[in-house]
Amino acid sequence: MGDFNPRLLKTIMIPRHTYTPPFSFQASLVKKTKANFEMVIARYDEDISWSDNYKEFRTVYNKGGSVDYEAIPLENVGHLADTMLRHIIDRYDTLADVTFFTHGSFNYRKDQIIKEEGPCDRLWSDFIKTDLDTLVYIPRSDLPAVSERAYDYSETFGEVYQRFFSRPYARDFEWACGKIMSVSRGHIHSRSKAFYQAMLDWILSPYEGGAPSQHVYRTRGIYIERFILHAFNG
């Protein structure tokens, strides 16, 4: 069985703490509230001042040290994947019309460049939507083969897909690069709360008889990254 090839990411890493100036406030949110649009930020130790123009819309899940703004503390596991799933599970019945899931910093990977203008993988304004059918992401279609594994993980992509979707894995859908996406409540509700709970339980489950390492958490996050958009598409 093949192992996951990091070259599939087509990624050139640059410093994670690259500073991003505050994004401009988008007119589409004038007279809107957090019930219409919620920005969910998974922070570790990043400077999230890029979101300062959206303070009234943001919810910060903080896995790092203390901060001087409102934030919900979380254990540092699962990267963005567990944060997304926890938010969906906890707010399933009270989700905003559109939820924008993102990391605590931007543009530290060359395949996930988001800007207000100019060459990039996606424009910032694309994500700031309140339409009830919103589904915005950086599209990729280079899914791993059914027998591939992410790094040295014990399950293949085919096995993990079967675990969640209860059918054979077919490489016929897109995935959302970086798990950065704006998703309508309707798209999220295309799956049951129990479906997302099963994903989170898998991320947090013991590995080889013990607590998962950060490497295992991040590796499981790669599987979720490949499949979460597919879940939102029903």
Feature locations, PLM:
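ER/Golgi luminal nucleotide-sugar-dependent glycosyltransferases, focusing on the catalytic module
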Residues: 2-234
